[in-house]
Amino acid sequence: MPLPDFHVSEPFTLGIELEMQVVNPPGYDLSQDSSPLIDAVKSQLTAGEVKHDITESMLEMATGVCRNIDQAAAQFSAMQQVILQAAADHHLEICGGGTHPFQKWQRQEVCDNARYQRTLENFGYLIQQATVFGQHVHIGCANGDDAIYLLHGLSRFVPHFIALAAASPYMQGSDTRFSSARLNIFSSFPDNGPMPWASNWQECEGLFRRLTYTSMIDSIKDLHWDIRPSPHFGTVEVRVMDTPLTLAHAVNIAGLIQATAHWLLTERPFRHQERDYLLYKFNRFQACRYGLEGTLTDVHTGNHHLLSDDTLRLLENVASSADNVGAASAINALRLQVKNGLNEARQMREFVTDGGSLIGLVKKHCEIWAGQ
């Protein structure tokens, strides 16, 4: 199946997807009963969408097309109230975080969905292990060539996005020593990491055609790239972030990505080339392992920069664009986060260090998401 034509969308519009954890109190393990909850929510929504993800312990909530983060926040807030009430009716609770800290992957049931069942057949237990929870942000583009330029531009800041959203230090009952352990789950997938090099939309079409030769790829949705074009939406989709613990933080991260996209496509500050990616996975690893305390290596000069310092530079560079797209509040909030050394992975570890249990940690995350 060829890659569809790139759908023209309004530049810099955005959509946000959040993969949420559905848990069973009082033990706070992952539930296997998301289907009745999702069915109960769907008919009550006035905007956005709630749907299944890979396994029965996941619920995906997604905005519609939004012009700015205020619209996205309003949609999410309305959806959240419906989800919370339906969850209470089903004796379930909801929380964010990139991983559940003590669930066992062997217990996870893949949704009864043709695409997910086909993926299970292709990848086996890896799909059950992929019961992890991420935030995806779509940015509208006018054409396919702009999308490819934007994809390469945003790829330079993948470590920054990972570090700002890092919220998965625990997995399978253990401290992983990573700030974001979630992305490690995908390391065994053959399409993990950045999109293979393509300099324009025509080359991307050729790349996709060759990938379909494997008989494992039917659509762009079958590819697990960190950032991928979504021609049916007319967007570029950033997929590297853990699901934050609060809707406010999720919206702020989306605002940064929207502002960065505006800066990249308006200023065109880079001439992208394939060798830009030579140290991509090393810098990505630093962000996953150490968060904002990681070290970035410049592939062209060999210079080292603290990820926190480089993130502050990014926030400064995109400030004017943030004003243009209505995301100034997001930039200000994230700047404060970086300067104060705040991150959700650290807060999780501090809770446990202070005597909290992993069960108590999930309970706390549910309270945070509910605004308690």
Curated annotation (Swiss-Prot):
One of its GO terms (biological process) is modified amino acid biosynthetic process. Gene3D superfamilies: 3.30.590.20. It catalyses: L-cysteine + L-glutamate + ATP = gamma-L-glutamyl-L-cysteine + ADP + phosphate + H(+). Keywords: ATP-binding, Ligase, Nucleotide-binding. Its EC number is 6.3.2.2. InterPro entries: GCL_type2/YbdK_subfam, GCS2, Gln_synth/guanido_kin_cat_dom, YbdK. GO terms for molecular function: ATP binding; glutamate-cysteine ligase activity. It comes from the Bacteria. ATP-dependent carboxylate-amine ligase which exhibits weak glutamate--cysteine ligase activity. Belongs to the glutamate--cysteine ligase type 2 family. YbdK subfamily. Homodimer. This is Putative glutamate--cysteine ligase 2. It comes from Citrobacter koseri (strain ATCC BAA-895 / CDC 4225-83 / SGSC4696).
